[in-house]
């Protein structure tokens, strides 16, 4: 029983340590982003708590590498709901590959979810370009309100 209890405690400590390391990486990335509404992370990791803790309300999208491509993710307004600070452009919703690349004007654009909360690009330059276009679109949508 002691061995099992020890394993549970060690696992909990390891999870907490990993969470703290991830939060430190996100905090450094927030500092590096400055006033940019785009947060670039070195890998996929939990980011919401660090963004809240840093008071980084200006951030709209997170860009990070995945196994073979890059993701552009919207940031939720609050931890409880699904509403985003900014949606990806409506014109991209549900598009893939050539259709997405044509609609966005970005070679390497691969996929945008119908819900407009995540898009995928072939590489970092394409992901950053899509994120910049999404910010421009979000600003236009905001001004129209």
Describe each model-derived feature in a short phrase.
Residues 1-145:
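C-terminal accessory domains and tails appended to enzymatic cores
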